[in-house]
Amino acid sequence: MTLLYEGKAKRIFSTNQENELRVEYKDEVTAGNGAKKDTMAGKGRLNNQITSIIFKYLQENGIESHFIKQLSETEQLVKPVKIIPLEVVVRNIASGSITKRLGFENGEVFREPLVEFFYKNDALNDPLITDDHVKLLNIASDEDIEILKSKALKINNVLKQLMDAMNLKLVDFKIEFGKTETGQILLADEISPDTCRIWDKATNANFDKDVYRNNTGSLIETYQIFLNKLEDLK
């Protein structure tokens, strides 16, 4: 078993199977592209368990991903994919960077979901880019761009239904996709309160990493409550 990659939140290892990788979730939390960073016991367990439940739910609703199964509290087994260097962001309600960029009021509900692409490049601070930029950078073709948008909107519909069942609002989320050796585009990485903005329906209280970004509560307690809500749906 060889360490293949280590990022801010995860380590990826080879296995004795050519078509399987092991992902280990770390106890680190970051914000502001790593400008703010802490280690919190239990964070890896929570994100792994939440992502495993959500990926299984998405698969049950026709959305394929790299996820195979959960191995332990902090580990999961996944299919190897070549990550497309884009963060695909879907926004249902205005919050975060879009309020500063375009002047929307925080909490303003969009008429329809907005899909944005951000170029995964730490040196450039992950800039927002257009479809034409995506093609110019040879990241994806016209066909792939349409597949990414279509999959992102389908994921949005399924996640909104899931959050609605927990009396929560899906404000926005970011996802990543990868390509298999045969060129199939699969959902990859994770879906957790690290990668979503989630509000309580009644109070608009955060159930996401904004409690850490804005120092408004305990990240571990917030994520545990969210996990409990997910598990209560089983």
From Swiss-Prot:
Transmembrane segments: none annotated. CDD domains: SAICAR_synt_PurC (cd01415). GO terms for biological process: 'de novo' IMP biosynthetic process; cobalamin biosynthetic process. InterPro entries: SAICAR_synt/ADE2_N, SAICAR_synt_PurC, SAICAR_synth, SAICAR_synthetase, SAICAR_synthetase_CS. Pfam families: SAICAR_synt. Pathway: Purine metabolism; IMP biosynthesis via de novo pathway; 5-amino-1-(5-phospho-D-ribosyl)imidazole-4-carboxamide from 5-amino-1-(5-phospho-D-ribosyl)imidazole-4-carboxylate: step 1/2. GO terms for molecular function: ATP binding; phosphoribosylaminoimidazolesuccinocarboxamide synthase activity. It catalyses: 5-amino-1-(5-phospho-D-ribosyl)imidazole-4-carboxylate + L-aspartate + ATP = (2S)-2-[5-amino-1-(5-phospho-beta-D-ribosyl)imidazole-4-carboxamido]succinate + ADP + phosphate + 2 H(+). The keyword Nucleotide-binding applies. PROSITE patterns: SAICAR_SYNTHETASE_1, SAICAR_SYNTHETASE_2. Its EC number is 6.3.2.6. Keywords: ATP-binding, Ligase, Nucleotide-binding, Purine biosynthesis. HAMAP family: SAICAR_synth. Belongs to the SAICAR synthetase family. This is Phosphoribosylaminoimidazole-succinocarboxamide synthase. It comes from Staphylococcus aureus (strain NCTC 8325 / PS 47).
